């Protein structure tokens, strides 16, 4: 009988473990599929428009092992052994040609967004065949997310393509900004979900669920918020949430061991990351004093 019970418990544990793995894989796959949908819509609807508006007929994004470009998530990731390239070329047709050179994994192939996928290529030959007049690269003076090309990678591109094409390099700063900022329907839906998660966690943080006046610290609230992000696999926009007490003279304390008291006016400034979207949200709360049932007039009319 004892052995039967042990076997039953072992089988139950196995079922629970398998079920847990299946659920986790389900969410991972859903996110991958959602990014694929977004990528397809962006490539179909936004990419031709922004390349032509910016008078660019080739856009090269370099991916290097250990050094991902900020746009890698947008373009589909994949394994890079040394150097890999996402190359978009306007060849005069309605659809922009999309190529992935030197970037592997079945996920890149299965996302269905690319016309050309190979790990065996001659970069100069590829570019010469298309003979672009303006080659946009990801270097930028003002926008960090458009400045993913390292100096070393820039030099390598110039050597590999030769002076003729190196003289045609232009910044992709405006192109990147336009591509990222023009949202398609699937992006708006995904961003709305990220915003709702951000709002929900922030408002729970400023409630009796988390805060006990005279006991809970600002750091306690901030760490609780971070824990919620980990539980549902959300990234962070700014690292540790900024949870602070504020007043007429500005910040009194910020995400530290300051104990929250009745009468404190609290604020949160934070954001979550979901897919390649990052929120930026603020919330405020007042901790009622003993006997208070409403916000003081001074706060309501602030």
Please name every model-derived segment.
Residues 25-302:
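Active-site neighborhoods and metal-handling regions in enzymes and metal-associated proteins
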């Amino acid at each position: 009988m004892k052995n039967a019970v042990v076997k039953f418990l072992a089988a139950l544990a196995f079922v629970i473990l398998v079920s847990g793995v299946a659920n986790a894989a389900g969410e991972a796959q859903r996110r991958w599929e959602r990014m694929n949908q977004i990528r397809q819509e962006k490539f179909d609807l936004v990419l031709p428009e922004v390349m032509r508006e910016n008078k660019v007929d080739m856009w090269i994004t370099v991916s290097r092992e250990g050094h991902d470009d900020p746009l890698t998530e947008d373009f589909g990731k994949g394994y890079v052994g040394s150097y890999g390239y996402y190359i978009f070329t306007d060849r005069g047709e309605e659809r922009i040609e999309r190529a992935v050179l030197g970037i592997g994994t079945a996920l890149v192939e299965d996302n269905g967004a690319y016309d050309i996928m190979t790990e065996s290529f001659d970069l100069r030959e590829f570019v010469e065949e298309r003979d672009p007049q303006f080659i946009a690269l990801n270097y930028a003076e003002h926008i960090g997310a458009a400045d993913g090309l390292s100096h070393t990678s820039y030099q390598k591109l110039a050597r590999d393509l030769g002076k003729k094409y190196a003289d045609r390099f232009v910044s992709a700063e405006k192109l990147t900004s336009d591509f990222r900022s023009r949202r398609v329907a699937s992006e708006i839906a995904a961003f709305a979900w990220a915003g709702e998660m951000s709002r929900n966690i922030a408002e729970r943080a400023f409630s009796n669920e988390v805060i006990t006046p005279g006991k809970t610290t600002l750091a306690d609230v901030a760490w609780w918020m971070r824990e919620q992000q980990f539980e549902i696999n959300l990234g962070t926009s700014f690292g540790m949430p900024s949870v602070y007490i504020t007043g007429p003279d500005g910040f009194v304390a910020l995400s530290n061991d300051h104990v929250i008291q009745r009468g404190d006016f609290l604020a949160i400034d934070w954001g979550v990351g979901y897919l390649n979207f990052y929120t930026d949200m603020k919330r405020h709360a007042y901790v009622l004093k003993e006997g208070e049932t409403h916000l003081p007039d001074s706060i309501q009319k602030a």
